[in-house]
Design a protein with these regions (language model features):
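N-terminal glycine-rich FAD/FM-binding segment characteristic of electron-transfer flavoproteins
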Residues: 1-323
Length: 323
């Protein structure tokens, strides 16, 4: 067995950021063993997407195509990937940890006599796979034992999409054998929820507010800071639940997952539900008057103080720098 296979999730011709994060995880894993990394696209008419993926410095990109894979079904994806894995014999199979992957990947691993190590947040030497337990209060380390490929899914924000390598990749095709009778579910048209007007996942600078803001009428103070920084404004769940900011501004387990260059957390205590959505940020700065607030445990820099004093001082400092 050799090589690392990264399954790229695409929907309606678009590749989600978490798929690039999975590629970064696969390339990080490959650096330990000098193994080639192959990206896998599943669907139909994948030529355009394959060209996009092929620019990421991979050994090859494999287009797994069949008319019955045009729309996602758990049966179709399991059958197609099982045949590909049996043909390619990879040592590791890496997935982005998405709802779709959770639907089919555990069963795929079981069909091949394996288990899925899900929601991995770090990969250490060995390799050692780390995932969070008890709502993030503990870390558990896992190793793969036995023969057969190791199946892993990586948590959103745990690996940086921008660290993927660059360079041309070979593109090949694979046609699985699938019969319509093997597909036990009938795909419907993709669900289209309310359009999300704010893509916090692509923001490089984020200013986020929590309960410490006290009242909706105080939000303009932080909005002014965000404007001075050229940052997107975000919030923890209580702010959005109260209707003080739209739901598409929410960061956390029930909101968006972000990994900006700077995440400025203002008046946020640091509940685990919020931390899982922003802990992948490159630099976290926290402002909170409670010195024991959990947010300081993940912050790179912390200011213990009243936000209503600190934020105006920051705005004044930024304005003075602009001259």
């Amino acid at each position: 067995m050799s090589g690392i296979m990264v399954v790229i999730e695409q929907r309606e011709g678009r590749i989600a950021r978490i798929s690039w994060e999975a590629v970064a995880a696969g390339q990080s894993l490959a650096s330990q063993f000098g193994l080639p990394v192959n990206a896998i696209l599943v669907g139909s008419d994948l030529e355009f997407l394959a060209a996009e993926v092929a620019a990421r410095g991979l050994a090859k990109v494999i287009r797994v195509e069949h008319p019955l894979l045009a729309y996602y079904t758990a049966d179709g994806f399991k059958l197609a990937l099982e045949q590909l894995i049996q043909t390619e014999q990879p040592a590791y199979v890496v997935f982005p940890h998405t709802y779709q992957v959770r639907d089919y990947a555990p069963a795929l691993a079981a069909r091949l006599g394996q288990v899925l190590i899900g929601d991995v947040v770090a990969i250490g030497e060995g390799p050692l796979f780390t995932r969070q337990l008890l709502q993030g209060r503990l870390n558990g380390n896992y190793r793969h034992a036995g023969n057969g490929p190791c199946f892993v899914s990586v948590q959103a924000g745990a690996f940086r999409a921008e660290t993927t390598q660059t360079g041309a990749s070979e593109v090949t095709g694979f046609t699985p054998t699938i019969d319509a009778a093997q597909i036990r579910t009938k795909p419907s048209e993709p669900f289209r929820g309310r359009s999300q007007t704010v893509d916090l996942g692509s923001a490089q600078l984020i200013v986020s507010i929590g309960r410490g803001i006290k009242d909706a009428e105080n939000i303009p103070i932080v909005q002014e800071l965000a404007k001075a920084l050229g940052a997107e404004l975000a919030a923890s769940r209580p702010i959005c639940d109260n209707g003080w900011l739209p739901m598409d501004r929410q960061v956390g387990s029930s909101g968006q997952t972000v990994s900006p260059k700077l995440y400025l957390a203002i008046g946020i205590s640091g509940a685990i539900q919020h931390l899982v959505g922003m802990k992948g940020s490159q630099c976290i700065v926290a402002i909170n008057k409670d010195p024991d607030a959990p947010i300081f445990e993940v912050a790179d820099y912390g200011i213990v103080g009243d936000l209503f004093e600190v934020v105006p001082a920051l705005i004044a400092a930024l304005e003075s720098q602009k001259g």
